[in-house]
Curated annotation (Swiss-Prot):
Keywords: Disulfide bond, Hemagglutinin, Lectin, Secreted. The keyword Glycoprotein does not apply. This is C-type isolectin Sp-CL4. Pfam families: Lectin_C. The role of this hemagglutinin in the venom is unknown, because it is masked by the high venom hemolytic activity. Lectin with specificity to galactose. Induces hemagglutination. Glycosylated with a carbohydrate of 383 Da.
Length: 144
């Protein structure tokens, strides 16, 4: 089996255009900004709202790579990060109102372990597979 590409190799191929003040375009209509300071899901969403946005929602494989690569560019490591999705009344939905149409769950997920995992993280240690976690965890995040 061939070794998977390194984050540096993967991210070198992802072209991102700056739109100023640490914001980068994730596609032609949306820009994103990474925040390293870990916050709970609600604290992170509140911060994004103060930036006139929401936690980032991912809709395509390319957007997942852009989000992962921003993490890599800022930290030179991949880690877990809040995304703008959560569970309400048993349904997973994006908090910006867009369709939850990109669901690359890690194996065995979502599992709602302990009955209290209502928020969604992208685990970029596993190249962006989604996992449901408790909303009280503190993670870095990205606003869009």
């Amino acid at each position: 089996d061939a070794e998977p590409p390194s984050p540096a190799e993967e991210c070198a191929a992802v072209k991102m255009e700056s739109c100023g003040d640490d914001w980068l375009y994730i596609d032609e209509n949306r820009k994103v900004k990474y925040f390293e300071t870990p916050k709970t899901f609600q604290e992170a969403q509140d911060h994004c709202e103060s930036e006139d946005g929401n936690l980032v929602a991912m809709h395509t494989e390319f957007q997942k790579y852009v989000v992962a690569c921003l993490s890599w560019i800022y930290n030179h490591k991949l880690h877990r990060m809040w995304i703008g999705a959560g569970r309400s009344e048993g349904e997973t939905q994006n908090i910006d109102g867009s369709d939850f149409d990109y669901a690359k769950w890690k194996g065995g997920q979502p599992d709602n372990f302990g009955g209290n995992e209502d928020c969604i993280e992208a685990n970029f240690i596993d190249w962006g597979y989604l996992n449901d976690v408790e909303c009280s965890e503190k993670l870095p995040f990205m606003c869009a």
